[in-house]
Amino acid sequence: MLWFKNLMVYRLSRDITLRAEEMEKQLASMTFTPCGSQDMAKMGWVPPMGSHSDALTHTANGQIIICARKEEKILPSPVIKQALEAKIQKLEADQGRKLKKTEKDSLKDEVLHSLLPRAFSRFSQTMMWIDTVNGLIMVDCASAKKAEDTLALLRKSLGSLPVVPLALENPIELTLTEWVRSGTVAQGFQLLDEAELKAMLEDGGVIRAKKQDLVSDEIAVHIEAGKVVTKLALDWQQRIQFVMCDDGSIKRLKFCDELRDQNEDIDREDFAQRFDADFILMTGELAALIQSLVEGLGGEAQR
């Protein structure tokens, strides 16, 4: 089981029913296929259990997990530039004239297509967890762009997907700033020793504190000067550590050893059973964490 490292959280904005059985058929129309010789990138669905199952969905307790795979061709800019310059020089020498800008632009496409079949590929996988009980979708990635790309693939597969980023009633950075300023956090949470503070003004500077007591005069001075906490390392119930960001994303999830070892009694050779048990355990813990976080940060914005 791939334990999630990050969470981008989305709210289903309309009541829609997502069932694994139906999704299995819908995702099958967009399974991953490798790049052809002229493709820059390809994205599609693969089984979340990898080679251990052909199923494109895995479900338990109203929770569904799916996995997107992306292949991107790597063509470094200097390589393209060098090949383009060589082509331009040859044509200009052959024709005895300088090429126009439009001619150079069309040559760039030609060069790109000639290089693509020889380009290296970079592969990445993104797990997505659908919580049908609470109407949430969580994407295991650190960037909004990657999350949106994966959601777009799901939307295309299903026909429609009404989702919006989970919005809170109060600005997250103001709540995080108050937690650091006062040293008092929401119940179940503890401050760790890492934070990022930014000035409200665009060019006012950034402070990154690591391995430092956050409830200190040094940090207080920055807050008094008008900086707000935009990232804050927290511990929840001594079970999960993470960094809360002002955009609502949850990064660098770290599950305690006791939690990760909870299913050690299951034979590792029985991959399917272990995957299922870990999935139930992880989603149960993360659903509780998200609920606690939303409450601690002042509640979800009214829809």
From Swiss-Prot:
Assigned protein family: Belongs to the RdgC family.
Name of protein: Recombination-associated protein RdgC
Lineage of producing organism: Bacteria, Pseudomonadati, Pseudomonadota, Gammaproteobacteria, Enterobacterales
One Gene Ontology MF term: double-stranded DNA binding
A biological-process GO annotation: DNA recombination
Subcellular location(s) of the protein: Cytoplasm, Nucleoid
One GO cellular component, as annotated: cytoplasm
Function of the protein: May be involved in recombination.
InterPro entries in the cross-refs: RdgC
Keywords for this protein: Cytoplasm, DNA recombination
Pfam families: RdgC (PF04381)
